Every structure is written in C-alpha cells, then in structure tokens.
Regions:
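Nucleotidyltransferase catalytic core that binds NTPs
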Residues: 5-17, 22-241
C-alpha cells in the first residue's frame, strides 16, 4: 500500500486525480510482477508491502473455514471489524466475560455480507492490535447463521444494531429464507448477549427490538445502566483522518 499526503492547493483537482491514478497503476503493476514507475513528486511517498500468511491464503481459497491464534474451541465470540478496536469494545468484552465466565475470542470476518472483502493490509493492521493474551480468529463466515454452524454451542457478543440486521429481510431472499437462517441458532444452540447502541441519535437496547419469537429466549440484554458507550470505530476513523 502507498501513503502520501499531497500539499493542499499545489495541484488542480484533475492533476491530483491523474497522480493518484498513476500511483494505483504502479501498485497494480508491481503486484503482477511488472514495472511501472511511480511519479516523481516533491512530497514524500511511503510504500509498504504486506505478505500474506499461508493461512490467510487458505482462508480466501476456501481451504479452511477459519484460522485462530488459540487452539481451544471458542465459547464467547465477539464479531466485529475492530477498525480500530477501542475502549468500548474492551468494556463489552469484560462485562460479557464477567456475566458468562467464559473467555472471549474476537472474530474478524474476511468476507462480510454487506462489506467488501478485507485486504491483506487490513487483516495485518487489525490483528496487530490484539495483545498476546487475547484470542482472535479470522473467518469466512459472513452471516451469523454461518457462524452458528461453524461454532455451535457459542455465545455471541453483539450490538442492538447488529441484531437488527440479523432479522432484516433485505439481507435474505425472502421472509421464509430469513426464518430458515434464524432457525439455525436453535439448531446449533446459539445465544446472544445484546448491548445497546445509539441508532439514528436514539439509544436502542434489546427491550426496544421486536425479536422473532423463535429466538427471543436466546437473547439476553445488557442494560444501559450497566453499559453505554456511544463511540464507534467509524467515528474514530473519521476523526483520525
């Protein structure tokens, strides 16, 4: 990947776009084994290469369903992009462990249902955040129904906004298809710890959601009095940028 901060006002918008295009072509050519010189400019250009781990390649080639830094079967799973991980995530982890008595495994999906696949750079940057005593796994399970099949008898730590998407019909072929996917939580004994989140400037918790009856008993809410943190990874990224 390439990093460069262009001096504001030094070039027209068109010149900046031409420069960026040339840089992208250079990186693409390099990844294919060809040479294409990066434009010479006054600003500093930093080029960094990330070499994929063999296990990452196996995951993307569907040779394995997941990889992990912990050989134990995960019991308490915290899915997310963690881009970046922040204090709110840590508090959720600690509360969930205290409530369940289980050890948390952070789950990062390389192929989310509603996001582009992660690049090798994004994978490395994300995994490098975790401490040595923290467990993580990288999976190919984009849907929660797929996670349920991959990790039966597990408890998932999720936000109310994520739970809303689990039973949002637009992510499925139709209503029947959605209910078939949701039924897998019963089939594989999956439970959820649901943390409240601010959605459209309003704090929403489990008690505000209409959860399908067939899995309602599998959802346990964490009250606002116990936890509330309105910060999001998206807001942190925007601030840093």
């Amino acid at each position: 990947y390439l990093e460069c901060y262009l001096d504001k006002g030094k070039r027209t918008r068109e010149e900046e776009e031409e420069l960026i295009t040339a840089c992208v072509i250079s990186l693409l050519a390099d990844s294919c084994g060809f040479e294409y010189a990066i434009p010479e400019i006054d600003e500093d250009i930093s080029i960094n290469k990330v070499t994929a781990e063999k296990s990452w390649v196996k995951l993307f080639n569907n040779k394995v369903g997941f990889i992990s830094n912990n050989k134990s079967n995960p019991e308490l799973i915290f899915p997310g992009s963690f881009n970046p991980i922040h204090e709110g995530h840590i508090k959720m982890k600690e509360l969930a462990e205290k409530k369940t008595g289980m050890h948390t495994t952070f789950e990062i999906c390389a192929n989310n249902a509603d996001k582009p696949p992660l690049t090798f750079y994004e994978i490395k940057r994300t995994l490098d955040q975790f401490q040595n005593d923290e467990s993580w796994m990288l999976t190919s399970a984009g849907r929660f129904s797929e996670k349920a099949e991959m990790f039966p008898n597990s408890v998932f730590i999720i936000g109310a906004d994520t739970l809303l998407r689990v039973f949002d019909e637009k992510f499925y072929k139709n209503y029947k298809d959605m209910m078939n996917h949701i039924q897998r939580f019963n089939d594989h004994n999956i439970n959820f710890l649901v943390f409240g989140r601010k959605i459209n400037k309003k704090f929403i918790s489990l008690k505000n959601l209409k959860v399908p009856e067939i899995i309602a008993d599998r959802c346990t809410g964490i009250d606002e009095e116990m936890f509330r943190d309105d910060i999001s990874s998206t807001e942190i990224r925007l601030t840093n940028n």
